[in-house]
Amino acid sequence: MGKIIGIDLGTTNSCVYVMEGKDPKCITNPEGGRTTPSIVAFTDKERLVGDIAKRQAVTNPERTVFAVKRLMGRKGDAPEVNNWKTHSPYRIVAGANGDAAVEVQGRQYSAAEVSAMILGKLKADAEAYLGETVTDAVITVPAYFNDAQRQATKDAGRIAGLDVKRIINEPTAASLAYGFDRKTNEKIAVFDLGGGTFDISILEVGDNVVEVRATNGDTFLGGEDFDQRVINYLVEEFRRENGVDLSKDRMALQRLKEAAEKAKKDLSTSMETEINLPFITADQNGPKHLMMKLSRAKLEKLVEDLVDRTIEPCRKALADAGLSAAQIDEVVLVGGMTRMPLVQKKVGEFFGKEPNRSVNPDEVVAMGAAIQGGILAGDVKDVLLLDVTPLSLGIETLGGVFTRLIDRNTTIPTRKSQTFTTAADNQPSVSIHVLQGERPMAGDNMTLGRFELSGIPPAMRGTPQVEVTFDIDANGIVNVSAKDLGTGKEQSIRITASSGLSESEIQRLIKEAESHADEDKKKQELIEARNQADGLIYGTEKSIADLGDKLDAATKSDIEGKIEALKKVMDGSDLEAIKTASEELSRASHKLAEQLYQQSQQGQPGAGPEAGDAGHAGHAGSAKGDDDVVDADYTEVKK
């Protein structure tokens, strides 16, 4: 088995770690960053991922997709998605299967497909770093992700060419990294506020055991919402001062988004920052500039209710764990938003202790994922991880009631069975409606799937015995089966993302991703060949200029002809033609190099009697050491 990489697939940024021996190591991207923006952009010619996609977002807002994690496993008409549509510069639609998708240049991309593009970039960066092919990964998800969102994440990994060995909850991964090699037993709370999601997990860590006691959260609360509050404020202030509504201008909104994110970060360390966006828009009177000061106090006033929304899940998680805030030994902060002083203050007040900031909030989740990869590969020994399912699972029963089979915060993997019966006389089949959630009525919870158990022999209602079994694997993914105990007939369903990608669609997207990988490789080879050709032309032309009249006309004409031939093909896309022309010019330029070398030797003092009238005769031996120096007669030439 090769290396298993650990990936934190974040809303705003993603990060990759790998175990090197017993130590987790961050894999930097080619740009030198330890995290990679979770952004994909489409241009007329190519697809861009990461930093390069982020850099061009202002000039290409409608084709630059960010925060796609917020759409994973969600319906196109879900309230959260409809809310996100109002702020998003790119187009969000309901796909053919009803799931949220993005539409760029007339083509629809599922959230899993866009996430796969990000994962593909992370995979390629890991391969470049390790110098070997990477096929296995552990990918993290928010603890409060439901089954559909987990399955969509796993599908994204498959499309990117990764065998996802384990889906692990982000706070659990963070606690794994925090508790790695710790011997003391502690009850910890992992407060994880990232770019798009919030999780709180209560765990017991120590003596190489990490046990999740309870988890809670909000999968639509994060840094993107904080940025949006700042954007709304800037738009309103600019409208009040200039009478211009920037919210209608997508390019201006993208500039505002970048400025809002930067201001938010700046205010974590300073009390005031200045937002300066020249030429943000124009009207009949000319260009308009946005220049505004934003204080930390104003920012905190804008977002205080968002921070307060994190407290209730903390309260619920503690109650589910059967603990009080005073019984928590450490509160570990995870996610970039926990750098905000107001967040740290509110967390400290709720738990009654100063939060622990000893871990890197941007990297600790990926580090934990890599440690989990090491456990699965057998490289990390004697570490036991006990995770939980975040939401209750059950089926719909008579009267539209949600009957739980597995309660939330049950340790996984787990298996639970319960026997049900028919609701009518001579009922030939039963429909099993599988649900996930906490509401008492089935209609208020999320549908994971439906299947039919047919062929039940005619009998009075209440007579047939149908055993329904729920099985949750270590990834938190659900399998459900129903068995007629009278006939032994059984029917089962592996719950996939609700109305999600079919197997044939996944296979098609895998092939497309592989094809893109080949295209990207060829494109990279073409760019490298062009760069080498450009360098060769520059060096050869410089050599010709340096030699001047000392280069005979025939040689000069031959080389210049080869330079023109290379220039003609290097802007094209024929890689072999560029390589051939480069090789021909390279061979010809060797003669130049020889002549240039001889010329440089002749012009230097100590090069011999031919060095020129003003030169001295050279030493007869080399000067490697005193023993090798040979005295020689010399004649002083007087001018």
From Swiss-Prot:
GO MF, one annotated term: ATP-dependent protein folding chaperone
InterPro entries, per database record: ATPase_NBD, Chaperone_DnaK, Heat_shock_70_CS, HSP70_C_sf, HSP70_peptide-bd_sf, Hsp_70_fam
Species per Swiss-Prot/TrEMBL record: Nitratidesulfovibrio vulgaris (strain DSM 19637 / Miyazaki F) (Desulfovibrio vulgaris)
PROSITE patterns: HSP70_1, HSP70_2, HSP70_3
Bias (Acidic residues) ranges: 628-639
Family: Belongs to the heat shock protein 70 family.
Residue numbers carrying Phosphothreonine: 197
Domain of life: Bacteria
Positions of region (Disordered): 589-639
Protein name: Chaperone protein DnaK
Function, as annotated: Acts as a chaperone.
PANTHER family assigned: HEAT SHOCK PROTEIN 70KDA
